[in-house]
Amino acid sequence: MSTKRVLAAVSGGVDSSVAVHLLRQQGYEVEGVILEFSPAHRAAVESARVIAEQMKMPLHVIECHREFEENVILPFCREYREGRTPNPCILCNPSTKFALICKAAAELGFDFVATGHYARVEHQSGGTAVLRKSDCLERDQSYMLYRLTQQQLSMLLLPLEGLGKT
């Protein structure tokens, strides 16, 4: 049986690094991916490169300036002008972040995608993937992922699902 491949979203931070470590411990072959949302995001990309090098992990960088502007910035500004305060991450996750990461994973031959979010995906009989709260309720981030599609959820591994953050 071949080793399953995971494309893990990394930020250069602790949570995504721990997620990569846990996936490797579980026997997955892991490569990293980071989205460059704008030129101002280049420092985060460089931070992720340093971490990826330290972890001896290939890193894929997806430049998505246009998608981020169209799917997140412009809708955020429209909502804000209407007196609402939208959460940009909730706008970004299904339309940009996970859409692009899942697309890249499929094109590059990965079996799964992963992030360092604190939430759970439950795979039910019949193939339905259901988003659930993290076992660590004080760190739960399921609300950030509630708009993901079935396709996105079915590909998603969340290795931090049962961990607390100290």
What do the PLM-derived regions correspond to, one by one?
Residues M1-R147, L157, L163-T166:
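ATP-dependent adenylation/nucleotidyltransferase module used to activate substrates
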Residues S154:
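Short, glycine-/aromatic-enriched active-site segment of Class I SAM-dependent methyltransferases
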Residues Q150:
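Gly-rich Lys/Arg/Thr-decorated short loops/hinges at beta-loop-alpha junctions or inter-strand turns
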